Amino acid sequence: MTTPRLHLRYKVEFPATFAGDHAGMGIVYNLGVGGCKMVSHRKVKCGDLLSVHLNVPEQNTPISILAAKVQWVLEHGFGVEFLEIQKVEQARLERFLDAQGHLAT
């Protein structure tokens, strides 16, 4: 049985990079203040800790997540839970999400 999400997720599609035990690039397909789904050809494992840099549209500087934990893995994608984010970056993420109109299913 899975644990329900605490935060809404929004349909998005933009690039991101991640680093940690594994580093790579991917595309974020849904995003909330608590985490995101990324599609990438780079392999990660459940439990891996990563830093994530979200290259959100119309912003010159990526939103940086200091620590995120891989919660699930599929063939070409994975889900991360955001564990640590600076307050300034959290506010940027929340402003971006407030402007999104489509909830992820």
Specify the residue positions occupied by each region the protein language model found.
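N-terminal helix initiation/capping motif
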Residues: 1-31, 94, 98-105
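Short strand-loop-strand
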Residues: 12-46, 51-53, 77-79
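A residue-level detector for short acidic-glycine micro-motifs
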Residues: 20, 30, 70-72, 84
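Short coil-to-beta-strand transition motifs
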Residues: 20-23, 59-66
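Residues located in well-ordered beta-strands
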Residues: 27, 67-69, 81
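A short, polar/proline- and glycine-enriched secondary-structure boundary/capping micro-motif
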Residues: 38-40, 50, 62, 89-96
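Short, compositionally biased
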Residues: 64-75
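C-terminal output/interaction extensions
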Residues: 77-105
